[in-house]
Amino acid sequence: MLKRKIADLIEQHLKSGSGRILLIDGARQVGKTYIIRHVGKKLFPNFIEINMLEDSVGARLFENAKTVDDFYLRVSAIKGELMGKAEDTLIFIDEIQAYPHLLTMLKFLRDDNRFTYIASGSLLGVTLAQTTSIPIGSIRKVRMFPLDFEEFLYANGMNEFAIAALRKKFEARESLDEAMHGKMMDSFKRYLLVGGLPAAVNAYLDTRNIQAVREIQREIHDYYAADASKYDAERKLKIRRIYDQIPSNLENKKKRVVAQRIEGKKGSTFANYEDEFEYLISAGIALNVQAISTPTFPLIESSGKNLLKLYLNDVGILTSILYGSNIRAILDNQRSINLGSVYETAVASELIAHGHKL
C-alpha cells in the first residue's frame, strides 16, 4: 500500500468529533477513494461506500433524494445491514459532484447527526459555485494531489528515520555527502519519469517497466482530456485545446498561455476562455501560476490577470508526452536536452502539494 500523508489528516478529523464533514477534492486518479476507504475501514466497524457517479449512470437511486429521510431510505435499500450508530458507522459519499444537491444536503446530514460522514469528488470548485445553497461551516474541504517526492521515497522503501534525517539536513541548510546526494538525485530522476499518480507508481514498483508506466500515464492523460465531454461541443473543444497545449506552451519562448494561440484567432483575450481555464484548474488537472509585475509583498497585489502559466498536475505525464520511452533524456543528464519545463512542473507540483499558492 502506498503511504499517503493525507491519511493522517483524514484519521485525525474522523477521530476529532468535528462538527464539519470532511470533503476531499482533487483530480481523478490521485487516490482519493482508496485512501478514504483504507482509513474508513480501519476506524469504523460499519463502512458504507456509495459511488454517486456510478449511481448516476445506473439505478439513479439518489437523483431525487431531496431530504435527509429520502437519503436514509435509499442507503437502507442497498446497505441497510451496515447502518449502526453514529460512532461506529461511516458513510462515504464518493463522486458527490454527480449530484450537486447532495452538497447542500451535507449540512442537514450533519445536523441530523445519525451517522458519521465523509465525501469526495472532483470539480468541486465548479460544482459548489453552481450550488444554490453552499453548506458554509458544515464542510471542511481539503484538496488531494498525486504523490509528492517524499511519498515517492516512502513508496520506494525509504523509512521514516531516513526521511527525518534528510529533513533535518535541509532545514539546517547542510549538504549531503556525495554518496547520499547521488542516491537522492537518482530517486528524483526516477520521480520525474514516474510521477505521482498511484497507478503509475504501483506499475513501476511492480514491474520496473517504463513502458507499462508510460501506457498508464497516456491513458490517464487521455482520460483527463476526454472528461470535458460533458460540456457542449464548442466548450469541450476549447478545453481540450488548452489542455493539449500545456506542454508546448512550457517549451516555447514565452513559456505561458497565449490566448490568441488557443484557437488561432486574432484578438482573443483571456476573458474568452475564463470558463475553460476554471474547468482545468478546478478539475485539478492543471496548476495555474499568475505572473507578477513587481516582486514585492504581497505578491497577489501585483499579479497580472492576463499573464497565466499552466502546468500539468503530474510531472510523469509531462515527461511521457515530451520524451516517451527515452529515459536517457532524464537519467543521463543529456546536455542537448533542456529539462527546464520538467523541473518547473516538479517544483510547482511540490509547492502546491505542501499548501503553497503558486
Regions found by a protein language model. Name each.
Residues 24:
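Hydrophobic anchor at the beta1->P-loop junction of P-loop NTPases
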Residues 2-17:
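Pre-Walker A adenine-sensing motif
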Residues 35, 39:
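Hydrophobic positions on the alpha1 helix immediately C-terminal to the Walker A/P-loop
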Residues 54-86:
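Short glycine-rich substrate-engagement loop in P-loop NTPases that contacts/grips substrate
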Residues 116-122, 143:
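Structural recognition of the conserved hydrophobic beta-strand(s) that form the central parallel beta-sheet
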Residues 128-251:
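Interdomain motor-coupling "hinge/lid" segment immediately C-terminal to the ATP-binding subdomain
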Residues 202-358:
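Accessory nucleic acid-recognition modules appended to NTPase machines
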Residues 32:
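Conserved lysine of the Walker
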